[in-house]
Amino acid sequence: MGFNIGDKLVYPNHGVGVVETIGESLYDGRAHPCYQVRLLANNSRVVVPVGNSDRVGLRPLTRRQDVTGVFRVLEDGAFQSNGDWKGRFKQNLDKMRSGRLSDIADVLKNLNWVQKQKTLSFREKKMYERARYLIVSEIAQVSGTTEAEVELDVEKALDRSVARRRSLGPNAR
């Protein structure tokens, strides 16, 4: 997938960025075409070789019509998780690394359910906050609304998920 200057994209686990320049950088003794991306979260800049963009997981923003599917994941009430926190953490980390917004929504929903049952570990709490930020910031960019508005929509979806989950009973998966 190729990007142009000014394109917004997603850098997995870091969030939305903008391609500021496309130039060449020297490494391994050769010049390689590279994207210089400014991450909107903290204004930091990363340089990604064009040839590595797929491997790194750079992707365009989620399409506007796919946002509905993300909210469906958030509110569906289904819960899949490894029983112990280490297994759950690894499972969720793999989903976070995929960079797909639907996978990140699944992580957020699952961790939201777990935190309703017990206190999250420090690492899971950080992952929960990161997943929430990544979802809110990307959907705000795609939909042209504020992060505060998206935050409210995400909270409502998570509340519906918990209500659905509770209606299924304690042994439902």
Regions found by a protein language model. Give the residues of each.
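Short, solvent-exposed secondary-structure boundary/capping segments
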Residues: 25-36
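Conserved hydrophobic positions within beta-strands
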Residues: 17-19
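Charge/polar-rich, low-complexity and marginally structured segments
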Residues: 51, 56-173
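A short macromolecule-binding patch
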Residues: 36-51
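Loop/turn positions that initiate beta-strands
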Residues: 6-7
